[in-house]
Amino acid sequence: MLFGAANIDLGALGIPDVTGYREHLYEVTAGRIVFPSVNGPIPAAWPTTPVGVTGFYTIYPDPDQLLTGQLDEALRAFIGSAPSQGGVLTAYAEADGDAANGGQFASLGLTKAKLLRVHAHLQALCRGSLVKYGAVVCGTGLDQVLFCPPGLDFYALDWYDNWNPPLIRGLNAWRENLERHVQESPVLAIAETNSNVPSQRPSWFATVYGWLAGYSAENGGRALGYWSYWRTDAGIGSLSGPWLPGDAATIAALTRIAAHCKDDV
């Protein structure tokens, strides 16, 4: 199982056995991130990561151009340049946010129906390559899960303590809704997770990982990876808050998880 983080290199911070790195490839205008947006870049080549670290990227391309094939050449070049260890790709992560109003990209013309076609198109472009394609949601209910089509390489969840979720019950609901309504025996991943309360991070990380590892053990290793998320520019009280280099308990918890992920293949 891959192990890593979004926005920071855990390996450079002293965590051993890091095998994954996640990044959102947002539209940037005048040095500022534009979000939500459906005009994000498609890199000319797969970004370089440290040896042994698999890159996991979220893209936000123009959906109409994508569905008419105008972006196929650029996407094939991007996907085809993934390194030998492969890569992980998704588009419009957390599109299920504000599901009751059609999702958080609906005001930009990316409806749920169109999103399902986008996911299918990108999955087809990744088929036969070294890149695994999937969908990332931020809700566990049926309305959120139905933002995912069947047939993807993986299905991932962003899951945060400050949303005050029913931790295990929520994860079980996500799995059950996927299995009953979208995809039998899905490959699952935790694409982002953290607690905004530093003292709760060790138990939060361990519990979320334990749930995913249990699913993997019960289903022949059908878990792709586990990524924490860090906002280096945010204070305590945001989704994550910054990495705290003196937080020995969290560092120890992540080190243990990394070692377990290395063995869970």
What is each of the regions a protein language model found here?
Residues L2-F3, T29-I33, G52-T58, G86-T90, ...:
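Structural preference for beta-strand elements that scaffold enzyme active sites
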Residues S37-C138, W230, P242-P245:
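Substrate-binding cleft of extracellular glycoside hydrolase catalytic domains
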Residues E27-A30, V34-P36, Y57, D143-R175, ...:
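Aromatic- and acid-rich polysaccharide-binding/catalytic face
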Residues V18-V28, P41-F56, E73-G86, V145-P150, ...:
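Acidic (Asp/Glu)-rich catalytic clusters
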Residues M1-P41:
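Boundary/entry segment of secreted carbohydrate-active catalytic domains
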Residues I8, Q85-A93, T193-V265:
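Substrate-binding cleft of secreted/luminal carbohydrate-active enzymes
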Residues A6-N7, L116-Q144, S185-S199, L224-T232:
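Aromatic-lined carbohydrate-recognition surfaces of secreted/lumenal glycan-active proteins
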Residues A6-L13, F35-N39, Y60-D62, Y92-D96, ...:
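Active-site beta-loop-alpha junctions enriched in small/polar residues
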